């Protein structure tokens, strides 16, 4: 039926309306098509219903309701901050009395940083404020100043991912009225038991922290010094606060180590400093209980606090330089940016403690006190502990050593302590000749004690496998080894005490050195009279795999790495004059390689089986029925599964695989790049590392996994196990520590907890992804020993010590090859040497030029973290049809993906009787269909 227009006005009106409808039709129909192409992403984002009904689930939540789970999350968050916060200074400041009245200073006191930005950003709408947490624990808080700050127009400007505007970055301190308004200064007389000053520093994905020139006002920079130094407004605040208060406490709300040396003396000295990191949504209650004294702090620093960043070896080559003969190719194509890890293995405490020993025993011109504020592993308590090494069992045949340590609480408060064990391998003439570096101390084990009452003791037993102390020799043995010589195991409270103990033992029988620090009785030493070589890998002999990642491979040994043989002569300098040779540029082109991967792919046999994925539950990975299943998958489904693996895996109807919903992290379930449901925001990984509590990490992994069950989430892009190479790295809140052993052990425990509920974790980012600037394709160069002993070490540990099912690669190049297409890294080391059979996924992909599909699949990659882009899917589909060898590799990837997701919560709700997917049409799909139908109908009538 057509509408009859009876007047020119009506005709004009309806003509205009027709144009509008035609325009809407042109816009909405393609939009609808695109929406259905990306239905998995939209389903994941728009599906906010909790999975309450868990009947017939392979993995069920341990909690009868989501409300009960959230209650536990709050309790666990408090427990984490109670165990993790680090007391750095306490001059008769803490704990406060039960009836204390305090005043909170700084704009940050009403606007704390709870988590990092970017992938670690989680909805914190229900966050607990510092004022509320203190008051709920019986401490009265000055309401007048709190209200003043809340009404202040000063705002802390933060940085945007991949587009940091350092000129706008502010500290946002508001000192103008707080010491001139009478009603405020009068309130200080009433709430004067303690002034609590909050110092905050943001960090997150896509940017590093400015080392100078930020916070630009009227053409001038207020932030002239580094962002991690105390700024003028903050120092002015502290100085004025001290006039009104006899007791001042600073809370460090930062994930990176700051230069707080000014707070330790003279006009800016405060009475107490407590590092609280990023406490997450509910963690502040734990902090308040420490301040009140209900909980005794037991956290130990996961990084080193230094005075001057220029003394930090890694800082000399940080941020990314451009090859001298090239210009910048763009923020998302950093092919001409590079960075050289010239500091080698000497990251954080490994440098400072080694330099300290050299200054004592070898006359190196180095002052520890002028460089280090607080050593790695440092942390005070309200009580005192004595640790005594009371015995050791050394088993030469088994290559093990067990230490027995008595820990006694000799103070007046109950509390926990952490036993830290550091090893030293003798630095020999062989090492000097073959360019093997050995730090003076390396964390090799740690254990947290039980809660000890005053005068109570605990015997802690620490078992050490000597192979874990191995070094890598890239020049002579070209594998791991333990050389002939002396070995030391030091029981200590921090890294500095550990080396002092060892020096004490070395010098106790000499008259030439009057070293009075340390306790030689807390060192166990032994001698190896034969060199031990470790060449046996899982399927491949261990040998050099990263010769081409060493810049000297291309520059004829032009670069000298930092060496303890002469720290003064080899201390790093900014390496800005490197030219890109023609050979190097040819590598950067990322040309497609032959599909001849070094790892074995079984021949696939064509079948007509109707086998479904669930039929293979509990079948061995190499069961021949897997070939039957894989050949039931169409080329289109294979390409979709592997090429569009962003925030979930694609469903496959033919084998009844429902696909999966995967989420970002690592502070909890944080949805994805497009939105989605956020879970509890737990304290940051940097803070959790200070707990030194493996059981706590296991509990955290399980708690997040329980929430994932309710959210219908299976994959979790966590934990972050990159190294805090530099305090100014923007993403330090997502990474545990500057120490690889601590990072690997804590990550392993988190993974173990999550695995119990069928959650597939993706520890990230493999590898050398230790800064954010120029991260998209930057070439990172390092020598083999450095890669293996520092940056690859956490991944090695999690593969060996946890049931990890996934690993995420990085944006950067490892040497000149993108991490996800580096065959030496993925195929040779991860797959063959370490025996990893899980899923290897890229970081987020969106058609970036250097992300070569062919080379990545050939290297052992399985999944592209692409969501809306069909670039990788289409390229995979094209190559499947034209290249049989490539298809074999794709089938191998599908095998790994499906095997791991079969043994996960993705299969919740399915059984052997399931003959088809539980497809239900989403509300958004119904809405689009109705809207499109109306458009067609209206166009027909007009």
Q: Which residues does each PLM region occupy?
A:
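Glycoside hydrolase catalytic-domain context in secreted enzymes
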Residues: 1-473, 481-491, 495, 537-942
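Terminal connector regions
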Residues: 466-537
